[in-house]
């Protein structure tokens, strides 16, 4: 048995299934979201100042919005990798383009 950086037990199959992840930070650096393209691996990091200065509603909204951005970017990158491998996956809501990601990123104002 192995342990991850938070001393959580990690089984051997989990060690072998690491997909590429993407990380998105809030502009103020108080919130970080890391996800893989499937959305199964998620890591959230909050700096102490976030819990002191944001209400629960603001925190929930910011986590949801930054998670969406990170997942969109991860899926855009996965679509690109698959297409480079010979598939022809069209841009969809589930597999957005990088332009779609950039457009959504402009709505993140925190």
Per-range role (PLM):
Residues 1-32, 43, 48-110:
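Acidic, negatively charged sequence signal
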């Amino acid at each position: 048995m192995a342990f991850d950086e938070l001393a959580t037990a990690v089984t051997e199959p989990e060690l072998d299934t690491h997909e590429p992840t993407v990380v998105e930070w809030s502009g103020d650096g108080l919130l970080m979201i890391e996800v893989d393209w499937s959305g199964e691996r998620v890591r959230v990091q909050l700096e102490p100042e976030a819990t002191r200065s944001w209400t629960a509603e603001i925190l929930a909204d910011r986590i949801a919005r930054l998670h969406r951005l990170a997942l969109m970017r991860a899926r855009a990158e996965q679509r690109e990798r698959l297409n480079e491998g010979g598939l022809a996956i069209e841009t969809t809501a589930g597999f957005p383009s990088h332009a779609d990601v950039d457009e959504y990123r402009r709505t993140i104002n925190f």
